Amino acid sequence: MGTRRSLAAAALAGLCLTAACSSSAAAPAPSPARSRPVATIVPASRAAASPTRAAPPAPVPRVSVSRVRTADGAVVTVATFSGPVQYVLHNGSGDPGPAAAGLVRAGPAVGGAERRRLLAAFNGGFKLSAGAGGYEQEGHVISPLRAGLISLVIDRSGRARIGVWGHGLPAPGEAVYSVRQNLQPLVKHGRPTPAAADWGLWGATLGGGEYVARSALGQNASGELIYAASISASPYDLASALVRRGARIAMELDINPEWVQLDIARVPGGRLTAAVPGQDRPADQYLVGWTRDYITVLASAG
């Protein structure tokens, strides 16, 4: 009798379990709960101990020098001036000479205060009598500026840029302090101009040859100035070397052996060395004074 009751109870339990399973299976599955982000709490002691990302080092003024061998075999020295630097246009004792001597402070020799910050110095453009462009220094127009000519423009703070005068240069409200013009663009929009291939357009050369000492100045997309020179090169050689080093625009500077010069120091105020192999003048020429205009590159004062 007891055994039958146990079997009946077990059967009833089996029915209930089966019904429960059937009912559960028939019911629609509940929609999954939407996941929510879980905040992770970091103890103050651990947060304080977590390493912090180091700030990037502050940029330093420097000159990066390289050599570029062009398609026709010319070797061009290229120097890029980067970091916090300032530029100063200097009057030469002979050109512009007396026309600017009583008006400007930056004369034929690098001054003492400037010497302590001097990172590099390089030659300017043609003699003003060559008619290659105008000249303004420290707000004084020594030779009239001409529209359509490539120009190095330096503002009062020492920042520099290169552009075509009268074509977006100067910009409205731009504080022009010094301007050095020299011929037409050598590089424009990151390419040598068509005129770069016609060497006869780029000044009278010593001996009337195409391959002579030449120099040029370009600017890259970051605003850095790039100087290029060779003791034996064509205008197109300089243009192609500058483009390979990132120049978007460039101008030819002076030509012929006596005038092409780049002197650089490893650190601001350090000993200068001649950077263009075969350049004619000694590395201290601009320190003792020079007859032609030139540009100094200084470590920024601020």
Task: Label each PLM-derived region with a short phrase.
Residues 23-144:
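Zymogen propeptides
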Residues 92-244:
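Aspartyl protease catalytic domain
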Residues 6-7, 70-73, 143-146, 208-210, ...:
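A short catalytic or substrate-binding loop motif that flags glycine-/basic-rich loops and adjacent residues
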Residues 76-80, 151, 185, 216, ...:
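Conserved hydrophobic/aromatic beta-strand scaffold that supports enzyme active sites
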